[in-house]
UniProtKB/Swiss-Prot annotation:
GO terms for molecular function: structural constituent of virion. Residues 1-18, 71-78 are virion surface. The lineage of its organism: Viruses, Riboviria, Orthornavirae, Pisuviricota, Pisoniviricetes. GO terms for cellular component: host cell Golgi apparatus; host cell Golgi membrane; membrane; viral envelope; virion membrane. The chain crosses the membrane at residues 19-39, 50-70, 79-99. Component of the viral envelope that plays a central role in virus morphogenesis and assembly via its interactions with other viral proteins. It is found in: Virion membrane; Host Golgi apparatus membrane. This is Membrane protein.
Length: 219
């Protein structure tokens, strides 16, 4: 029976040839996502990266459950069951924290699997929300020719003289307020401002109005 199912060298080479091109494209895609999937580089690639990360939990659970139902041996069945349980608990924890953050900010960025920090910047009659990958006690705002970048991310058109005096960083369990402590202009409608943490509390951020998040996605 084993001789009938044993693959020959030619069959193995044929299988590798069939999958080689597909795997080369998959690894190229993974490389692009890992290298350029940052909000400061390309928001479009970053959103795709978040989608891929979001699929890892259910994929891990599905594979673990399949391995537990159709095990190789008893040891693999036990390990697969443990992995499935851990993946399920991590996924549930993620949803709990994301829902808490969504209730605090009202932004769909709350379901970002990479970070649970959201930077809320009020300007232009709205509040623009962006994921904050690095948790810090201070945030730098740079306005160049009327275009705002904070923490390396694009926020759109904004006059330097109309920069908000306060921004907030939302987490599932706390809202941190940062006040402008220093600013310096260096050209026409251009300058730098530094925001530093000065208080924190368990309350909601100001309501978001017409935050065209998806329309502001930019490379």
């Amino acid at each position: 029976m084993s001789n009938m199912t044993q693959l020959t060298e030619a069959q193995i080479i044929a299988i590798i040839k069939d999958w080689n091109f597909a795997w080369s494209l998959i690894f190229l895609l993974i490389t692009i996502v890992l290298q350029y999937g940052y909000p400061s580089r390309s928001m479009t690639v970053y959103v795709f990266k978040m989608f891929v990360l979001w699929l890892l939990w259910p994929s891990s659970m599905a594979l673990s459950i399949f391995s537990a139902v159709y095990p190789i041996d008893l040891a693999s069945q036990i390990i697969s069951g443990i992995v499935a349980a851990v993946s399920a608990m991590m996924w549930i924890s993620y949803f709990v924290q994301s829902i808490r953050l969504f209730m605090r900010t009202g932004s769909w960025w709350s379901f970002n699997p990479e970070t649970n920090c959201l930077l809320n910047v009020p300007f232009g009659g709205t509040t623009v929300v962006r994921p904050l990958v690095e948790d810090s006690t201070s945030v730098t705002a740079v306005v160049t020719n009327g275009h705002l970048k904070m923490a390396g991310m694009h926020f759109g058109a904004c006059d330097y003289d109309r920069l908000p005096n306060e921004v907030t960083v939302a987490k599932p369990n706390v809202l941190i307020a940062l006040k402008m402590v220093k600013r310096q202009s260096y050209g026409t409608n251009s300058g730098v401002a530094i925001y530093h943490r000065y208080k924190a509390g368990n309350y909601r951020s100001p309501p978001i109005t017409a935050d065209i998040e998806l329309a502001l996605l930019r490379a």
